[in-house]
Amino acid sequence: MPPPLVFLSHSSNRTPGALEDTGKLRDALAGASHDVQLDFRTIQGGDDWYAKILEWLVRCRAAVLLLSPDALQSDWVYTEATFLKVRKQLDPQLILIPVLIRGVTKQSLSSAEKFIPLQLHTLQCIEATDAASSAPQVLAALGPAVHLVVPEQVQAADKIAALLVRMGGMDLSNTFVALTLAEPPWHPGTDRNTLMAQLLARHMLKLGISSATRIMDVLGRGIDASAKADICRILAAFWVHEKAANHISEAKQRTPTAWAVAINGNFLPDFTAEAYARRAFWPSEQWRFIPIEGGAGTDFVRHVTESILKWVERRNPGSQRKPEQWLARTDISLLVVIPERQWVDHQALNALRLKFPRITFILETGEELPDLHGEGFSEVTLARPALDLLEEDKAQQAFSDAFAMIRGD
């Protein structure tokens, strides 16, 4: 994820070379991986510059005020400085750095009639000849550009919001009324429909998959069915316990062959396994289940092997590479569900793991999650905490009902 935004306030209209000087400071900060927003470098022709600057003023986590003689006469710099000083009082975490350049001093700043009420001279100021030469001190004041680690739930909400926005022509106001939600206040620089989509997405995640049928009904018919289906899949993934799901991604990293994962439940092949995988690899979509076709017969290893190789051939028609070569090189995380544990003993499972070292095999254990190590399954991870079967049943039923409604659109 990108680092927090840094806003650069300046006035460069009257002094020759001032724009170039300000641009050099911006480049120095950007070169240290800061996300710097500067009007004449970032705003393009046709953009609503006023809305864009307001958005930066609201969103920035740090701001640099370049206070030159021109800036102290600028109504717009005064407006930006006022907004940022109020933000600083409300949010002490905001980094606000006055940089005094081209002869401006703390004393002259404190006596500048327009800026006196802001008391900017009481902040830790940087004094420099020009903007470019202030770069080392500004970088020290900003500190390292720490990239944000966005929680999975926030990423999921953003994804759902993007899907809601994709449903063109939908009036989210009606959805808010139906769900008895308060509409969000206006936020400068942001489309109102986008704000409503973000709030609705967070509400969906809070309610979870159990609310899917109600939400699909409220969204209405005739709306992008594929987007609604994707929303249901995300809600299903976040029903799964994160710790249990992570056993799948961790098992894939084992060497020299991926470990198998044992999961209890009653709906593994049709619902639960996909929810586990989506949560395990979130937000990546680079994973696939390989279905095991038909009955296992007497030679289980041979049957599974043939099913895997046929799936690869169907996926890559006309490929010059053999299925085994594709399996060895693909970046896609591949999984195979073994829906009946009695189909395989530890020797057969080990044979499959050796034959397909990059595939994660998932064992369905039924209602309980027994300790399989006593049965000789030495390289099997138990997906704990175990599933609550009642919760699984509710989630699967809600998911199934929601999809039935989507298919009826």
Where are these regions (language model features)?
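Conserved P-loop NTPase "ATPase switch" module shared by AAA+ and STAND
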Residues: 310-353, 365
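Conserved phosphate-binding/catalytic loops and adjacent sensor/switch elements of nucleotide-binding enzymes
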Residues: 269-272, 287-313, 317
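C-terminal interaction surface of TIR/SEFIR-family domains
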Residues: 1-31, 100-189, 193, 198, ...
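Walker A/P-loop-proximal flanking segment of P-loop NTPase domains
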Residues: 216-262, 271, 275
